């Protein structure tokens, strides 16, 4: 194993851990990351990053995995969500934030409100592509782990970067998100699930999203267990699947009422 793939033989391939960035040379990824311990499934082919942009194809629901781990418990929750959307014939797109380059918000608003514009002034990373996805999707389902009773920093950076969409209302410009639907899924080892969900929702509420009825689903394992047993618990617990199916179903039912079109131009934007 090596962290230098510049001289990788033709028979080998460069792999990058999506969690910590460790580079590995070999025909296939390692069984686990030598640096952060993540399973080999977290590795992606290494190579030059292509800036992400939305291709313009319409779809209904945007699925966001806010975890640093693509294939962990949070990813499993989105697997279940995707299964339910497929079963209902609802179009969707799924993204793992760990696979994309999303920089910290520049906080242009703190300098001058007019500087926080849409499109975002930072057009060099992948977030402008996600801005377009948010403007297009009728509904969003966000899945998040619990990090210290809150969402992980990766997801917070993503949500911080939606400020340019929220600021449209302060600049008296047409909004792009009011009346859309949001659902939230949270999992973790112990405490903080509901707080995490509500912290996430506050961002969307400030953009005019409506939380689907019974639109929050969460499950924790417990501090008395070793975290290495969480994966087996979540994948074998029937309540997890039922709750996710319920949240997804509620989001879809609410979305199909087309509240967004009914409220267009009728809402008074009240946000920070």
Per-range role (PLM):
Residues 16, 32, 104:
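The −1 position to Zn-ligating cysteines in a subset of zinc-ribbon hairpins
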Residues 171-217:
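Short, glycine-/small-residue-rich phosphate/pyrophosphate-handling segment
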Residues 17-26:
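Short Cys/His-rich zinc-binding micro-motifs
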Residues 97-103, 174-176, 207-230:
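Mobile beta-alpha loop/short-helix "lid" or hinge segments that flank ligand
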Residues 2-3, 21-22, 35-37, 45-172, ...:
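N-terminal beta1-alpha1-beta2 submodule of the flavodoxin-like/Rossmannoid cofactor-binding fold
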Residues 11-13, 29, 98-101, 178:
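Short metal-coordination and nucleic-acid-contact micro-motifs, chiefly zinc-binding Cys/His arrays
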Residues 28-39:
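Cysteine-rich micro-motifs
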């Amino acid at each position: 194993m090596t962290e230098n793939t510049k001289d990788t033989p033709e028979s080998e391939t460069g792999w990058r851990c999506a969690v910590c960035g460790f580079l590995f040379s070999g025909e296939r990824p390692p069984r686990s990351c030598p640096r952060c311990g993540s399973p080999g499934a977290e590795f992606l082919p290494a190579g030059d990053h292509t800036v992400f942009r939305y291709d313009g194809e319409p779809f209904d629901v945007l699925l966001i995995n806010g975890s640093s781990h693509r294939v962990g418990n949070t990813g499993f929750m989105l697997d279940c969500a995707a299964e339910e959307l497929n079963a209902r014939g609802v179009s969707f797109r799924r993204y793992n934030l760990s696979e994309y380059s999303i920089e910290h918000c520049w906080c242009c608003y703190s300098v001058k409100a007019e500087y926080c514009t849409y499109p975002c002034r930072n057009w060099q990373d992948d977030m402008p592509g996600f801005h377009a996805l948010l403007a297009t999707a009728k509904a969003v389902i966000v899945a998040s782990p619990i990090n210290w009773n809150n969402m992980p920093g990766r997801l917070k950076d993503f949500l911080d970067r939606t400020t340019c969409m929220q600021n449209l209302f302060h600049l008296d410009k047409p909004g792009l998100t009011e009346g859309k639907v949001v659902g939230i899924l949270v999992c973790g080892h112990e405490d903080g699930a509901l707080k995490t969900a509500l912290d996430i929702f506050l961002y969307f509420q400030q953009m005019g999203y409506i939380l689907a009825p019974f639109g929050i689903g969460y499950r924790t394992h417990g501090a008395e267990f070793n975290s290495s047993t969480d994966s087996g618990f979540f994948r074998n617990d029937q309540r997890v699947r039922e709750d996710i199916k319920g949240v997804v179903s509620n989001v879809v039912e609410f979305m199909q009422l087309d509240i967004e079109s009914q409220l267009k131009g009728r809402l008074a934007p009240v946000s920070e």
